[in-house]
Every structure is written in structure tokens, then in C-alpha cells.
């Protein structure tokens, strides 16, 4: 009977007597999704169950930043696609503007 096997699993040891996992094990799935939550959790020493303090500020800063500004700027310069797009757009706009100016000068002279 399946109920009996489930009951036997829970009756072997009390719920209170089971060792609870340390906070690092509990937060391991959340640490990748929410690094700022993992950074705010206190340090825990499982051998003597004592609070050892919070993480250092370097860990907190690393948890909040995903990529440095220098890396993102260098990637933009290496790729060059946005720069090429902007320069092409400026060239097209300046051509249209020159055509418009030339057209308005020609109509002003004839009038």
C-alpha cells in the first residue's frame, strides 16, 4: 500500500531531528537568479552552527554588477556596427539636406 510506504518514510525520523541544510545549499538555486539576495545573506559555519558575519563588500559589488562599463564600451568599439549605422544614417541625412538646399536655391533664383 502506497500510504504505508509514505508513512514509513516519515516515521523513521522526526521532522525536527533531521538536519536542515545550511543557507548556502538553500540559496544555491537562487544565487544565480538573484545574486543580490545571496549577497545579503549572513555567513554560516555548519560545523559549529555559528554566525560568522556578512560577506565582504567586494562580494556585494560583484553581485550587483554584471559587466563593467569598460568591457561594454570596448565591445561596442570592436564590433563597430552601431558606429557604421550611425555614420551611414548621417551621410543619408546630409545628402537629403544638401538636395533640399540646392533645390530651394534653384527655385529662389528662378523666382
Swiss-Prot record:
- Pathway(s) it belongs to: Secondary metabolite biosynthesis; terpenoid biosynthesis; Mycotoxin biosynthesis
In residue numbers, the region (Disordered) covers 1-24
Listed GO biological process terms: terpenoid biosynthetic process
Tell me the function of this protein. Part of the gene cluster that mediates the biosynthesis of the neurotoxin verrucosidin, a methylated alpha-pyrone polyketide that inhibits oxidative phosphorylation in mitochondria and thereby causes neurological diseases. The carbon backbone of verrucosidin is synthesized by the HR-PKS verA, and further modified by the other verrucodidin cluster enzymes.
Q: What is this protein called?
A: Verrucosidin biosynthesis cluster protein U2
Q: Which organism is it from?
A: Penicillium polonicum
